[in-house]
Amino acid sequence: MTGGDPRAARVRAVLAGHRGDESEARSLLGDADVGTRRAALGALDRIGSLTTSDLQSALKDTSGSVRRRALEIAAKRSDVEIGECLYDSDPAVAETAAFAIGERTETTAVPSLVAMANDHEDALCRESAVAALSALATVGEVDRAAILTCLLGVMNDRPQIRRRAVLGLFQFDEAEAEEAVQGALADKDRQVRAIAGDLLGVVTD
């Protein structure tokens, strides 16, 4: 690990990414400063030199901030396993993992996403899981029945989660899904009603 002014180290990491200096960026991956490690990850990604091993190590970093940055990058790649990150003790990391899995359309993660959507204590994690499940609902080889059951169930959750669920339910042809979207026209949350109205072509208040 390096010492010194963390601000200077962060600047070095950012500049390394823009200059294509892999050696400089790599030397800062283990810096004591969290922000520098994040910047070094981004720099190597920008250069195109971030290896699978680099990313795997970052996903195990002691800082949740670095783990989140690694997941943001992993959302665009398929060479690292990120399913376990759904169980991270830091809710912000778990939320980002759900986002990344949705971006990667990883159908094998459906059971874990369903569990998160139903049971996670953090509302943002539940919302991210519902958004990911909605994205996965359109993928060929996926357990659509499990996704449908979950989306119907979370229509009793907070407004921001119901909004996500309505978007997912609209992708199903099953009668219960159509009924739920229709029912959302009378939701107590105005934005939920508006989303349902936009999807159905109905004017709402």
Regions found by a protein language model. Give the residues of each.
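Structural detector for internal amphipathic alpha-helices that build alpha-solenoid repeat scaffolds
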Residues: T2-R19, S27, G35-S49, D54-S57, ...
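HEAT/HEAT-like alpha-solenoid repeats
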Residues: D21, S65, A92, V110, ...
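TPR/TPR-like (Sel1-like) alpha-helical repeat modules
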Residues: L185-K188
